[in-house]
Amino acid sequence: MSNSISVSFNDEPPGSIDPVRVENFISEVLKDLNLKNWDISLLFCDDAFIQNLNKQYRDIDSPTDVLSFEQGDEYFDEAGETRFMAGDIVISLDSLSFNAEEFNVDINEELKRLIVHGILHLNGMDHSDNSPEQEMLKFQEELLMQYKNMEIYRV
């Protein structure tokens, strides 16, 4: 059985993001992490939307680039196969653009970074701050090297 990946947009999707490319990227990351039978969703939104979520669930009244909502529930599908409801990732397109400019990186690279970051959180990894010495962030950057040539954002 394979992973189930859903990509959606809070507003009209920008032409620069191809949901199929994003789904393929997520599928590759899950495969490389040996995560099977996962159900995962990714929602693209704006800063206002993610700020509301950040305030509601983390009591932080400001936008952020990515949020992960881990569900962690196992269930059986119609065929009796065990599946894992991993959870949801929310990415702000406003913060994506800001980060790419602020950190002087390609927007495609930053999008992959935010997606991988969300997946690692859904897989139980965490970090106490954003310093590059954090184990999760080191692992994230090592993992991203594998996808250096994979384009998911059309410029």
From Swiss-Prot:
Enzyme category, top tier: hydrolase
Cofactor stoichiometry and binding remark: Binds 1 zinc ion.
Biological processes annotated in GO: rRNA processing
Gene Ontology CC: one annotated term: cytoplasm
Cofactors, names only: Zn(2+)
Entry-linked InterPro entries: MetalPrtase_cat_dom_sf_prd, YbeY, YbeY_CS
Intracellular or extracellular location(s): Cytoplasm
Gene3D superfamilies: Metalloproteases ('zincins'), catalytic domain
Sequence similarity: Belongs to the endoribonuclease YbeY family.
Protein name (Swiss-Prot/TrEMBL): Endoribonuclease YbeY
Species classification: Bacteria, Pseudomonadati, Spirochaetota, Spirochaetia, Spirochaetales
